[in-house]
Amino acid sequence: MKVYISQLTETENIIDLLEKYEIGLEIVLFASPYCLDRQDEFIENYKIELGDLYGKINLGIHGPYADLIPGARDELITKATNYRMQQAYDVAKKMDANFVVYHNGYYPKTYSYIEWMQRTPTYWNDFKEGKEDDDIKIHIENVHEEDYFLLNELMEEIHDEKTSVCLDVGHVNAYSKVDVMEWMKILKKYIKHMHIHNNFGDRDSHLGINKGELDIIEILNIVKDKDITVTLEITNVDELRESLDILYKNGFIKLREVVKNNV
């Protein structure tokens, strides 16, 4: 298991954490259409902000999601979705990122299960064309799904080792009718990335790992010896620091060599 943190604040607020721990960074900036359209400028800014860490830490990209619908009825919406998602993939290539996370985009109150599955597998299979030789993994994330059936069937239809599930445990707790342990049991062969944050089941709060009703340590113990990446998606920087300290004390992450040598 390799641990990343999500950049939900300015780089200067988390740079010391990246320097202290052996963790990677999942960049959220390119979820913004504005940044995607100016990606070369923002990539150069990132190189400056990360300094000596750039090229030394593992990177992932969180792709765009607002207004994007892979299973859209309207072909124009599908084209816009593909355009933005391809832009994020291009960023991942330019930054030598290991993966891109995309939202599944399913809204239970808007689309029927059958309707969504008629179009979405085709979308993802088409999206993968021409990318066979790339090392970038594609992780499809649950958000508003009420159960795991749709993602399970989607993975069965895609048949690609580089395309997998990003299980967001906070989203499961906030939106699903099914316990997160059941999600993990059913989707275990497809889960290659996870978003880790906590809440009390009433909203998608993105709290620290010890601030909600999920037992995050129990969840991580299930996957700690697997070939999987996990990203802490915690909004409050102090809660992120506390969460990383907990992971360190429980043996999930290590100090960087430069830190250990200076202790």
Task: For every predicted segment, state its role.
Residues 1-87, 257-263:
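N-terminal pre-domain/capping segments
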Residues 2, 16-17, 148-155, 160-164, ...:
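Histidine-acidic metal/acid-base catalytic patches
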Residues 6-10, 28-32, 64-66, 105-107, ...:
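Active-site beta-loop-alpha junctions enriched in small/polar residues
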Residues 14-22, 40-61, 88-96, 128-133, ...:
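Acidic (Asp/Glu)-rich catalytic clusters
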Residues 34-35, 67-72, 107-113, 174-175, ...:
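A short acidic, helix-capping loop that chelates divalent metal ions and anchors anionic groups
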Residues 39-46, 77-85, 114-124, 152, ...:
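Charged helix-capping and loop-helix junction motifs
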Residues 70-164, 258:
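Active-site acidic/histidine proton-transfer and metal-coordination neighborhood
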